[in-house]
Amino acid sequence: MGFPYWLFQVLPEVCPDLLPGKGYASLGFIYEPGHDLPVGMSQRRHMGIDRVFLNCAVCHAATVRTSPDAKPMLVAGMPANQLDLMGFQKFVQACVNDRRFTPAQVVPRIAEKSGGLGILDERIIYPLGIHLMRDGVAGLLGRLNFIHLQPDWGPGRVDTFNSAKAIFGVPFERLPKEELVGVADFPAIWNQGRKQGMQLHWDGNNSRVEERNLSAAFGTGATPKLIDHAAIARI
């Protein structure tokens, strides 16, 4: 699952006017030197195509400086206080539905950025991938369409649990208006053992750290069958 790697890489070039600045960094994504994917973006090969998508670190990693002139230090586990996650969702949805998101516009950019494509990739794989990505984004973000009923979350904030409800098919049209907004700051996730038994979530409705972490993972697209319990337990 996830976005084809090269399609993800060229989206900011296809629709630069739909971003607040240059590239994904303008939405608060963090890039480490020597890496071509932002922190919190995992990559794996599926059905012969390299695919990328968000993982937990995208919301729970940020940088700090010891002085205004110091080099930023990446700190895992702290809130991603510059990340505009709603902005990212809206950008992807708008770009894949834009008239520019076509094989004629996108494939040449991939060929240029990747150093060249074989005939199979140029004529079949990526043209098909463009249509599949449009359909996939329509399916996923169609479920997350409730974000268009909300005010902008702003950087460092997310409506995680409405996202989880949406992914699992909760009919938002049946929810009372006061339940449509559940936006909260990204939390720090270090020293979680000390939080066991505390009243967790933004409304304090659960006391188990494990449940909080699983619910957050479901909100970013994890599924009960595929979720990595061991990796989540390490935090």
For each of these PLM feature ranges, what is it?
Residues 71-82:
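Short cysteine/histidine-rich metal-coordination sites, predominantly Zn2+-binding motifs
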